[in-house]
Swiss-Prot record:
It is found in: Endoplasmic reticulum membrane; Endoplasmic reticulum-Golgi intermediate compartment membrane; Cytoplasmic vesicle, COPII-coated vesicle membrane. Residues 1-8, 60-77 are cytoplasmic. GO terms for biological process: vacuolar proton-transporting V-type ATPase complex assembly. Required for the assembly of the V0 complex of the vacuolar ATPase (V-ATPase) in the endoplasmic reticulum. The lineage of its organism: Eukaryota, Fungi, Dikarya, Ascomycota, Saccharomycotina. One of its GO terms (cellular component) is endoplasmic reticulum-Golgi intermediate compartment membrane. The keyword Endoplasmic reticulum applies. InterPro entries: Vma21 (IPR019013). Residues 30-38 are lumenal. It is a multi-pass membrane protein. It holds the Pfam family VMA21. The keyword Membrane applies. This is Vacuolar ATPase assembly integral membrane protein VMA21.
Length: 77
C-alpha cells in the first residue's frame, strides 16, 4: 500500500538528517582548531547533535498540531 507523504515532510527530514551529520562534525573540528581540549570539542559536538534532535522534535510537534487544527476545520465545514 503506497502512502502519499508530503514533500515538506521529506524536505524537513532530509534537512535534519544532513544537520545531524554535518553540524556536530563541523563543531568538533572547528573547536579542535581553536582549543587543544578534545573533551570540550567532543562535548560540544554532542551538544550540537542534541540541539538538532530537539529542534526536529519541536518541528514535528508543531506540524502535528497544525495538521490537527486543519482536520478540525474540515470537520466543522
Amino acid at each position: 500500500m503506497p502512502v502519499d507523504v508530503p514533500r515538506s515532510v521529506i524536505a524537513k527530514l532530509m534537512f535534519f538528517t544532513v544537520a545531524m551529520v554535518v553540524l556536530p562534525v563541523l563543531t568538533f573540528f572547528w573547536l579542535q582548531e581553536h582549543t587543544d581540549n578534545t573533551l570540550v570539542s567532543g562535548g560540544l559536538a554532542a551538544a550540537m547533535a542534541n540541539l538538532v534532535l530537539i529542534a526536529y522534535v519541536i518541528m514535528a510537534f508543531q506540524e502535528d498540531s497544525s495538521s490537527s487544527e486543519d482536520d478540525e476545520t474540515k470537520k466543522e465545514k
